[in-house]
């Protein structure tokens, strides 16, 4: 009952069947199930992608509250970088199973290096419609880019910010 209360569910929710829950309630049940084991790490793979924006915010706020209360770490896997920015201290950008760029949330958002990272960030809608209308979105086509993920090494950008690429790509992207 304590765990259910912690995630915002009433004790009677323990007697319900999965089809009787809303999407947000299902996520809360999933979080409660994970918390019962008192984990040091929770892997949350696309845990909010199927929820509407207001419910996403509620679930992410709940996760942040639990993290502050328990010290639990999250590996938060998502395509929605605006939510990733809100919940994460550090970000790793993966594409086709390759870790392309890592750094603090600030480093990645303020100075993205890899073209794939830049394309993901340019897909985040801006709240100012005038700025949004003028912005040119970056697209990324791995095949057309000529980038071979199997080549290259980890290049230090600054602080804890690294990007995996060849020396030539690093020089070109950091101009």
Model regions: which residues?
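Conserved ABC ATPase signature
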Residues: 17-21, 25
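Short catalytic/signature loops enriched in Gly
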Residues: 105-175
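A short, proline-enriched helix->beta-strand linker immediately N-terminal to the Walker B motif
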Residues: 36-40
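Hydrophobic anchor residue at the start of the ABC signature
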Residues: 31, 43, 59
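Conserved ABC ATPase "signature" region
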Residues: 1-12, 121
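A short, surface-exposed alpha-helical micro-motif characterized by mixed small hydrophobic
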Residues: 84-86
């Amino acid at each position: 009952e304590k765990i259910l209360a912690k995630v915002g569910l009433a004790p009677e929710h323990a007697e319900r069947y999965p089809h009787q829950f809303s999407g947000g309630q299902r996520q809360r049940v999933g979080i409660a199930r994970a918390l019962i084991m008192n984990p040091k790490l929770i892997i949350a793979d696309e845990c909010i992608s199927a929820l509407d924006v207001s419910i996403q915010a509620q679930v992410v706020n709940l996760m942040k509250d639990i993290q502050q209360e328990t010290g639990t770490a999250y590996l938060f896997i998502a395509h929605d970088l605006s939510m990733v920015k809100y919940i994460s201290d550090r970000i790793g950008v993966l594409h086709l199973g390759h870790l392309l760029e890592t750094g603090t949330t600030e480093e990645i958002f303020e100075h993205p290096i890899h073209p794939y990272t830049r394309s993901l960030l340019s897909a985040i809608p801006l709240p100012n419609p005038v700025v949004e209308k003028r912005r040119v979105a970056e697209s990324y086509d791995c095949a057309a880019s000529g980038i071979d993920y199997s080549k290259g090494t980890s290049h230090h950008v600054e602080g804890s910010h690294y990007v995996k690429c060849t020396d030539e790509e690093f020089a070109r992207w950091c101009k």
